[in-house]
Amino acid sequence: MENETIKERFLGTIFGQAVGDALGLSTEFMSKQEVDRFYPNGIEDYSQIVQDDHRRRWQRGDWTDDTDMMLCILDSFVACQKVDILDIARRFKEWMMNGGMGIGRHTYNVMALGDYTSNPQKAAEIIWKMGKKKAAANGAVMRTSVVGLLKDNVANNAENICKLTHFDPRCVGSCVVVSSIIHALVFEDRILDYEEVIGIAEQYDERIVPFVDLVYHEGLDSLCLDDEKSMGYTLRTLGAALWAYWHATSYKEGILKIVLSGGDADTNAAVAGAILGAKFGICHIPEEWRNGLLHASLLHDKVQEFYAMYR
């Protein structure tokens, strides 16, 4: 594959996530009915984001915790020139201590444990077991896109980085699927088919399979993304991303359909956005969305630095 194509998709992955996250904030936590009420003509631009108590905490065009935490991982890869699990955990904790805006409850509970930075995976396991092994939130899959941009050991690294906060096998499987999809797109110009994704899912948890099934054969609406009780479930987010991967005809079409579905829209659009960015390349992300990001130039510098590791 041409280096230019790899670079296009590499940049597309990170910008695709950040744009999806920033645009998804517009409908985060809304029901489909509320989305239709606040955005009767859809949404085309960050300037249209309604300013209620939740959304006004961010400036328009800013991304949220999803991309903040993904950048903690990226910064660690660049600083250490390798995967250093404890360094990533330290950066997560530092981000949390410096405000950590938008942090999920589960992630906060794990990182609030006293010895988190010295044994993060143990902390994640403790909190998971305390919750009777029921919690499978989307706080790890939301940041895993960058792991797919590593040259090798993608599955193993996705597992280990996921377990820094989320120990449940549904979370781990979600991260491995997303990272593997991105890696195959960027470095091999290859789309994983239904059987391959099912094969990865079955290695981690059988409960992933019905969600893969659903989005492969049905539309996005079958996921009920705005379901109040389960909108933060890792398998709903994975499902939305897989729907975009297999069915969306462009970055813009896929992202807008997910954003206008409401629910945990910033996370759903962040993960789907990373995959669509990897599939179509940065040039196919609308220019006004890329340039409209509050920290577009900072993001560009960070990605260039990470990409330079491969030269």
Q: PLM features: residue spans?
A:
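Structured, active/binding-site neighborhoods that engage oxygen-rich ligands
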Residues: 1-311
